[in-house]
Design a protein with these regions (language model features):
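Class II aminoacyl-tRNA synthetase-like tRNA-binding/catalytic domains
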Residues: 1-109, 117-119
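Long, highly charged amphipathic alpha-helices
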Residues: 14, 18, 134-145
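Residues that form generic nucleotide/phosphate-binding pockets
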Residues: 22, 135, 176
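Short, flexible, solvent-exposed loop/turn segments with mixed acidic/basic and small polar residues
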Residues: 106-111, 185-188
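Glycine-rich, often proline-containing surface loops adjacent to acidic residues and nearby aromatics
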Residues: 111-121, 193-194
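Short, structured patches in soluble enzyme cores that scaffold and shape functional sites
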Residues: 120-124, 200
């Protein structure tokens, strides 16, 4: 590693602090605290693909009712937007932690999830391709800005990054790489353009 373990921890904190400030400003988001566990049967936990097993256990203080560790905040975020009274143009973000016991692990994936999660209220008129593209560009700008600041603080991590985004559809990828899997197509187009946003996934 280019950094020591201690430097790595400092860098992680710096990146997380800076990126959340930049992203929240770009997308008009408030930080909220998300649950790690929810009551089983509440309908809040997301089933993902419907086959992943949830981590569950009983809680003595609520008559041994079963609780589950969250796998995704997709349903909870929408509920939170409603309960907190957010309006069009406003949203929330959270530093999500979860456990996905059946995930395939690699250098990018772990059974322990630590990721940014966000949701925003939009109008019916904003449900279009142009608004999606502008949102993606705003996120990329936040990432690039963070990367530049990190490079200044940690020159050993410096490498060029620009704000250009190439938009492609799943059908275009299938036409271009007919003999590849969906994951292989994503990797190939990312290598070709540096970064891309795939649309019309399903």
């Amino acid at each position: 590693s280019a950094l020591t373990l201690r430097e790595t921890q400092h860098a992680i904190k710096y990146i997380k602090d800076l990126f959340q400030q930049t992203l929240s400003f770009a997308l008009t988001l408030d930080r909220v605290t998300a649950p790690l566990i929810v009551e089983q049967g509440s309908g809040i936990n997301d089933d993902l693909n419907g086959v992943e097993r949830k981590v569950d256990f009983t809680i003595k203080e609520i008559d041994n009712k079963k609780a589950e560790v969250v796998q995704s905040l997709a349903k909870w975020k929408r509920m939170a937007l409603y309960r907190y009274g957010y309006r069009a143009g406003e949203g929330i973000y959270t530093d999500m932690n979860a456990i996905r016991r059946d995930d395939d692990t690699d250098n990018l994936h772990s059974i322990f999830v630590d990721q940014w999660d966000w949701e925003k209220v939009i109008t019916r008129e904003q449900r279009n391709e142009e608004f999606l593209k502008e949102t993606v560009k705003s996120i990329v700008k936040a990432i690039v800005y963070t990367k530049r600041k990190v490079s200044l603080r940690y020159p050993v991590l410096a490498n060029p990054m620009n704000e250009t985004v190439t938009f492609v559809t799943t059908q275009e990828l299938e036409n271009r790489y007919p003999d590849k899997t969906s994951k292989e197509r994503e990797n190939l187009v990312a290598k070709e353009y540096g970064r891309s946003e795939e649309r019309r996934v399903g």
